Design a protein with these regions (language model features):
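Positively charged n-region of N-terminal signal peptides that target proteins for export
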Residues: 1-4
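Sec-dependent signal peptide cleavage junction
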Residues: 15-35
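Short active-site neighborhood of thiol/selenol oxidoreductases, capturing the structured segment around
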Residues: 47-60
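Typically the conserved alpha-helix immediately C-terminal to a functionally engaged Cys/Sec
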Residues: 52, 64-79
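C-type cytochrome heme c attachment motif
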Residues: 60-67, 117-118
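Thiol-based oxidoreductase modules, predominantly thioredoxin-like and allied folds used
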Residues: 81-99
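Non-catalytic, surface beta->alpha helical segment in thiol-disulfide oxidoreductase systems
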Residues: 114-158
Length: 160
């Protein structure tokens, strides 16, 4: 009977260690992926330089937001020389919500319950996201970069 209990304990211990190892590997994979598509900007990160500023307001867990982050990752190597991307999570962060409210007021937009993603490229607004918007996003980045001297910089956002 003692041998049976010892064998059961050893099997349960081995099974538990295997589950922990698999869980750890999965978490490491998720963390690696999220590092590639996760942005946690602060208002103090915002720079006003020779690039177009892009402000992305998102909600943690929003699938459309995640798809938009993935899209920005896919164009980063070719287009990031044209823009600074600042992303603010607004569902769980009240301070970031105030930043979104600032832009909503500037663009005279009314969105309910922090509708996300809410994207601003230079002085143009995009509400929501689907892959059908991809070319429009690239065209807007290029156009705003070419005309960046004529775009309001919203530097007063730093006073929030």
């Amino acid at each position: 009977m003692k041998k049976f209990i010892v064998i059961i304990v050893i099997l349960l211990t081995g099974l538990s260690m295997g589950i922990i190892t698999l869980s750890s590997q999965k978490n490491n994979q998720e963390n690696t992926n999220s590092k590639n598509i996760s942005y946690e900007s602060k208002i103090t990160d915002i720079k006003f330089n020779d690039k177009v500023n892009i402000y992305l307001f998102y909600g943690k867990g929003c699938p459309h937001c995640e798809a938009l982050f993935t899209y920005f990752e896919s164009i980063k190597s070719k287009y990031s020389k044209y823009y600074n991307l600042y992303a603010f999570e607004v569902w769980y962060n009240e301070d970031n919500g105030k930043i979104m409210d600032y832009f909503l007021e500037k663009f005279d937009k009314k969105v309910s319950s922090r509708s996300v993603p809410f994207l601003i490229i230079g002085d143009e607004v995009f509400e929501g996201y689907s892959s059908s918007m991809n070319q429009k996003i690239i065209d807007t980045i290029e156009e705003k970069y070419k005309n960046r001297d004529n775009i309001k910089d919203f530097s007063d956002v730093l006073n929030i």
